[in-house]
Amino acid sequence: MKKMKSKIYLPIEVKRRELYSRIYFSIKASIQGYSVTIGRKSRFHEFEKKIQPGNYISKSAGTQNFDHIKRLKKAGHKIFFIDEEGLMSFNKEFTHRRFSEEGLQLMDVIFTWGNNHKNELIELYPSLKEKLKIVGNPRVDILKDISKQFYAEEIKKIKNYYGDFFLLVTKFGKINFVKRKNIIDYYTSHLTKGYLNTEKLKEICKRSIKHEEKNFVNFINFIKLFNASLENKKL
């Protein structure tokens, strides 16, 4: 029997965004001899005293997560950090507003999406340079040609049901979201969480909301134009 190299813990924050890619990663890691555990981030917090020391891939480096990370390190875990939202950046201060140098210093290794992501973090936090490793993200790996078989059955079912169609992927989370008890609006939510701690960040946040509002109007207009111009096509 092949001896397991070590344990890897993969907390999941947003199921639809992360689950398939984490399953894919787990299969690859298991083949290499690792024992992998996938679960909700909140459940890892709940059972942190029961999991054996291993490689914990953290999703959060904010102040609210400091104590959790410190307890894991004290228990013998090696802490890695992956930022699910680090791929797209129009302003490095705004993109990385959700965590601080203090939080990132708690990490043993910080995974980055690529050179741009790594260089931005070096510019913001020069002391972290040796911790940064370019690894990409399994969410991209499962989209590559070699991995499309991962979705083969699901693709077949969708095509059989809908036929040929154009898939228009959108993201209007700043203005078109479901209101919850703890989320009134995008700006207030970020302000309350302490992410907008400078006037510059507040202004960028307001501008990004305005930008999305304009794009949302353009999106609606595009749908109308598409339907009028290509009546026989599905969107």
What are these language model-derived features?
Residues 148-235:
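Conserved catalytic-core segment of nucleotide-activated headgroup transferases in glycan assembly
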